[in-house]
From Swiss-Prot:
Gene that specifies this protein: TPS12
Cofactor(s) listed: Mg(2+)
Pfam families: Terpene_synth, Terpene_synth_C
Source organism of the structure: Ricinus communis (Castor bean)
Protein name per its UniProtKB record: Probable terpene synthase 12
One function term, GO molecular function aspect: terpene synthase activity
One GO process term, biological-process aspect: diterpenoid biosynthetic process
């Protein structure tokens, strides 16, 4: 049991694990609340505070509470169950062509239905492999070979880039006869992003197929152009699953060869999932409103909706409601505390705050400004309550894991504050080594691990040591964030981000630095592609959550800072996933 691995610090008291709804034993405990008072104003020197001028939230409490999907998850449950059985029969139909089955599986995944058919999909892929894999497919079909390669690799089967050699010439370039094969090129392009380190053929295919797709985009019919543009914007394996499902339902609806049963199930399932998301969001909106930080901390971002959107990217499936709620609390607190470090606190105050988090000691913040006390106590009470629930439900003592993650995050925030205050530009390597921690992906994933409820001794040890499964998604998170926010950060006086550090160290232009950052993002994704096939101590739900930590910033930072300064694109994404249901008129 992990509890034996750690020395329990003297800050640990009964209060840490007492639920607010359970009577407290009659012992002498310090009362912890968010009513801490700072010194009287005339005793505290006036400090000029910065302002980031973050725009207010557009998603008001009253608006969120007014959302109503009419309990779609209950209303359509029986109809969806019958459709699900029909689709299951299609997957398990051994008399149909294997390519048809693979295309069905691909459609199921893109429509956000894979979690309903996990065993059936595995059974179908096992059957495909036992039959000879790609050797039972049409050998001259680039689409068939590429699709099978992508699906098998994503599901952890051994496949090799040599499967594509029949389509390449002696120079390693695509044979001319395939260069006008739109479906084949699209499938090969998507498959190439599932490459592992050392797979040069696939690495080269990324660039080559992109050139062909750009050419095809200029000379193809309108219905094909939409699919090509979508793929070129971001490859499928890097997209948020539910956001892709929303887009693909509309695209699939336009296809002449669409399967009516599958399409109807996808629409019902989306609306049912959305109904659950709305209830989760309402719960979190009440929590955030009662916490009161948005009203008390005028300098900080009020981003409850954006934080909840994050959690949909992490785990959208209905069974992960508790996980979404927990992660909404975590990401909301990360946003607040990030602003304490970036905008509000003096360096001396931040040193004290960091020490308090590391010691997990409420007494350590008593001399800090009121808003910093509120921030710490909100963190302290929320995380202790989450730890209490985990101990109660799972019997797992997780305070050491959670507090270490928060302490390491605050240390990384503090390092960035030191660079900013001293106008220091660190080396690129030093920045990235600190930056993947300050991105907060590791904190989110440590909490997600326990919220998903699959614990093992070896995995717990890996959490403490920040296994690569936490590191590489966090690298993508950091670099995507920097690509979107570097200009605003420099305007606030922050000197260190990956772009400025790379420019300064290598004496290159901003354009060249951005190009290099994108290459590093690709490299990180190549590392992550190993998660599905490499032996790890983590279960598939957590592996998928880790990859999702990298998918989300690829979405929200694609065209700007959708977290700090949400724009119309951000609003449209929220609207399409959480607010606007899919019309069932055609169903």
């Amino acid at each position: 049991m992990a509890i034996n691995l750690f020395k329990v610090s003297n800050f640990y008291t009964m209060r840490s694990y007492v639920s607010p709804h359970v009577p407290v034993p009659n012992v002498n405990l310090q009362s912890v609340s968010c009513s801490a008072k700072a010194e009287l104003p005339h005793l505290r020197p006036v400090i000029k505070r910065r302002s980031a001028n973050y725009p207010p939230t557009i998603w008001t409490y009253n608006f969120v509470q007014s959302l109503n999907n009419h309990n779609a998850d209950v209303l359509y449950k029986e109809k969806a169950r019958k459709l699900e059985e029909e689709v299951r029969r299609l997957i398990n139909n051994e008399s149909q062509e294997m390519l048809t089955t693979l295309e069905l599986i691909d459609g199921i995944q893109r429509l956000g239905l894979a979690y309903l058919f996990e065993k059936d999909i595995k059974g179908a892929l096992d059957r495909f492999v036992s039959m000879g894999g790609c050797h039972v497919l049409p050998r001259k079909s680039l689409h068939a070979i590429a699709l099978s390669f992508r699906l098998l690799r994503q599901h952890g089967y051994e496949v090799y880039q040599d499967d594509f050699k029949d389509f390449m010439d002696q120079k390693g370039e695509l044979l001319k006869c395939f260069k006008k094969d739109v479906q084949g090129i699209l499938s090969f392009y998507e498959a190439s992003f599932c490459n592992l380190e050392g797979e040069d053929l696939l690495e080269k295919a990324k660039t080559e197929t992109k050139v062909y797709l750009n050419d095809l985009q200029r000379n193809s019919k309108s219905d094909t152009v939409e699919s090509i543009s979508h793929a070129l914007e971001l490859p499928l394996c890097r997209r948020m699953v539910m956001l892709e499902a929303r887009w693909y339902i509309e695209a699939y609806n336009k296809r002449e060869d669409s399967n009516y049963t599958l399409l109807e199930l996808a629409k019902l399932n989306f609306n049912m999932a959305q109904s659950i998301l709305q209830r989760d969001l309402k719960d979190m909106s009440r929590w955030w409103n009662n916490l009161g930080l948005a009203n008390k901390l005028s300098f900080s971002r009020d981003r409850l909706m954006e934080c909840f959107f994050w959690t949909i990217g992490m785990a959208f499936e209905p069974q992960f409601s508790s996980c979404r709620k927990g992660l909404t609390k975590v990401t909301s607190l990360i946003t607040t505390i990030d602003d304490v470090y970036d905008v509000y606190g003096t360096l001396d105050e931040l040193e004290v705050f960091t020490d308090a988090v590391e010691r997990w000691d409420v007494n350590a913040v008593r001399d800090l400004p009121n808003c910093m006390q509120l921030s710490f106590l909100a963190l302290y009470n929320t995380i202790n309550e989450m730890a209490y629930e985990t101990l109660k439900e799972q019997g797992e003592h997780i305070i050491p894991y959670l507090t270490k993650a928060w302490a390491d995050l605050c240390k990384a925030f503090l390092q960035e504050a030191r660079w900013s205050h001293s106008k220091c530009i660190p080396s690129f390597d030093d920045y990235v080594e600190n930056g993947w921690r300050s991105a907060s992906g590791n904190v989110i994933l440590v909490h997600a691990y326990f919220l998903l409820g699959h614990n093992s001794k070896q995995a717990l040890d890996s959490l403490l040591n920040y296994h690569d499964i936490l590191r590489w998604p966090s690298v993508v998170f950091r670099l995507c964030n920097d690509l979107a926010t570097s200009s605003d950060e420099l305007n606030r006086g922050e000197t260190a981000n990956s772009i400025s550090c790379y420019m300064f160290e290598n004496r290159v232009s901003e354009e060249q630095a951005r190009e290099q950052i994108n290459k590093l993002i690709d490299k990180a994704w190549t590392k992550m592609n190993e998660y599905h096939i490499g032996a790890t101590h983590f279960g598939e739900p957590f592996i998928e959550a880790a990859i999702n930590v990298a998918r989300i910033p690829q979405c929200i930072y694609r065209h700007g800072d959708d977290h700090g300064a949400p724009d119309s694109r951000s609003k449209e994404r929220v609207w399409s996933l959480i607010i606007e249901s899919i019309s069932l008129v055609d169903s």
